[in-house]
């Protein structure tokens, strides 16, 4: 049987699905550790920019988990994603260790821009700024990609890069009580929050796992962006980002929560 993870319900994705909005026709690049073949995922393509790891299969688990939150299929098994009909692309920029280079991430963003991706999910970050990475975010944005990035997990009162760059949509994490997760980095530049604690999703080996992190929050927003793009195909990435913020459910302090909790129901009304 299929179960609906708490975060999928909390962001009110099923209400959008009931309107026929499932992310159909929307291309989402997952810049991560790759995505493993899985019965609950439909991977349309991708590329690897990790030296020595030419396959887009996931040797870590992180990318497969992120992908399921975006687009786990609406079928009779496993879990359900925010945008189950979105087109997933596995863009490997992190190796099996879970880490990667700025140059790999920049190449992944360039691939997203070159290949007509509507959304790029970057559940990754660094405390250090990089001119190369900032330029890659800006370039992808100028080519129509909505770059969605994790705020970081150090709990600090400033957010990671590339999330902190103006053209990246920075996502923090909340728990089941709609409180900021203790690890979720916050501060200037935080755009929005989403569920990031005890998030159940797909995992390599045709299995499932529960993970914590702003990495898990970010794909809820990438998925919601896909729903909005399907409903409003002419909208730009900037319009989609602003709409997700304007329709978010306020949770109080913008320093801690940005515009609030992403709300797929309100965003697809």
Curated annotation (Swiss-Prot):
Compartments, as annotated in UniProt:
Secreted
Biological process according to GO: proteolysis; sporulation resulting in formation of a cellular spore
Q: Which residues bind Ca(2+) 2 per the record?
A: 163, 165, 168
**What chemistry does it catalyse, as a reaction equation?**
Hydrolysis of proteins with broad specificity for peptide bonds, and a preference for a large uncharged residue in P1. Hydrolyzes peptide amides
Q: Recite the UniProt keywords alphabetically.
A: Calcium, Hydrolase, Metal-binding, Protease, Secreted, Serine protease, Sporulation
Cofactors required: Ca(2+)
Residue positions annotated to bind Ca(2+) 1 are 2, 40, 73, 75, 77, 79
Signal peptide coordinates: none
Q: How is the cofactor bound?
A: Binds 2 calcium ions per subunit.
Superkingdom classification of source: Bacteria
One cellular component GO annotation, for this chain's record?
A: extracellular region
Biotechnological exploitation: Used as a detergent protease. Sold under the name Savinase by Novozymes.
Q: Which Pfam families match?
A: Peptidase_S8
Report the GO molecular function annotations.
metal ion binding; serine-type endopeptidase activity
Question: Which ranges does the record mark as transmembrane?
Answer: none
**Catalytic site positions:** 32, 62, 215
PROSITE patterns, sorted = SUBTILASE, SUBTILASE_ASP, SUBTILASE_HIS, SUBTILASE_SER
Q: Which Gene3D superfamilies match?
A: Peptidase S8/S53 domain (3.40.50.200)
Question: Residue limits of the Peptidase S8 domain?
Answer: 5-268
Question: According to its UniProt entry, what is the function of this protein?
Answer: Subtilisin is an extracellular alkaline serine protease, it catalyzes the hydrolysis of proteins and peptide amides.
- Please share what else the UniProt entry notes about this protein: Secretion of subtilisin is associated with onset of sporulation, and many mutations which block sporulation at early stages affect expression levels of subtilisin. However, subtilisin is not necessary for normal sporulation.
User: To which protein family does this belong?
Assistant: Belongs to the peptidase S8 family.
Its name, as the record gives it, is Subtilisin Savinase
């Amino acid at each position: 049987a299929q179960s609906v993870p708490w975060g999928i319900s909390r962001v009110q994705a099923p209400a959008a699905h009931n309107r026929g909005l499932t992310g159909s026709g929307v291309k989402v690049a997952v810049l991560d550790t790759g995505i493993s073949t899985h019965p609950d995922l439909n991977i349309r393509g991708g590329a690897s920019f990790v030296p020595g790891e030419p396959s887009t299969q996931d040797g870590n688990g992180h990318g497969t988990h992120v992908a399921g939150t975006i687009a786990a299929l609406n079928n009779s098994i496993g879990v359900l994603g925010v945008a189950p009909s979105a087109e997933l692309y596995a863009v490997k920029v992190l190796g099996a260790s879970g880490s990667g280079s700025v140059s790999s991430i920049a190449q992944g963003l360039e691939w997203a821009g070159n290949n007509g991706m509507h959304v790029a999910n970057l559940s990754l970050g660094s405390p250090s700024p990089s001119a190369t990475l900032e330029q890659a975010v800006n370039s992808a944005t100028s080519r129509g990609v909505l770059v969605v990035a994790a705020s970081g997990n150090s709990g600090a009162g400033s957010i990671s890069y590339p999330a902190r760059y103006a053209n990246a949509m920075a996502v923090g994490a909340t728990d089941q009580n709609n409180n900021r997760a203790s690890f979720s980095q916050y501060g200037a530049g935080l755009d929005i929050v989403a569920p990031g604690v005890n998030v159940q999703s797909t995992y390599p080996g045709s299995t499932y796992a529960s993970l914590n992190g702003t990495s898990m929050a970010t794909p809820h927003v990438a998925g919601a962006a896909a729903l909005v793009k399907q409903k409003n195909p002419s909208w730009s990435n900037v319009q989609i980002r602003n709409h997700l913020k304007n329709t978010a459910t306020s949770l109080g302090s913008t320093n801690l929560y940005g515009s609030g909790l992403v709300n797929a129901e309100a965003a697809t009304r």
